[in-house]
Amino acid sequence: MKQPDSLDVGTKMDVVRHRLNVAREDLDTAHLTFKAGKYRAANNRAYYSIFHTICAVLAKEGIAFKRHKDTLSYFNKNYVQPEIFPRELGRKIVKAEEIRHASDYDTFYIASKEITAQQIETAAKILELAEKYLLTESEQQENEI
């Protein structure tokens, strides 16, 4: 079954809200799997929370990429380097992708409780910052109308 293109499902803000909801759901699942001691799964869901949060930010511009690499690269270039989002967060996003990849594909990777907790913390922080950024942007546009 063909998935609808993000531009076919409503306004840009509809797509932003949907992607933020998916990011929140992923973060909730990361917390649940973490509490159950399923650290590999929690790393996966924390990363996807980060990824869907970034996709929400890019959706505000009407931008979407097919590959994660392109999405993360664009976000770092256009949001982290100009310090719309903190540079330290950019480094944590790169680390999150590496850990998710190891958790998913390296059968000998042992996901630690500490690193997984850091991943979840990073996901929560970027979601918080993105929601604040997107809300501020939306309010500014409404005031201009």
Identify what each model region corresponds to:
Residues 1-145:
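Terminal alpha-helical segments
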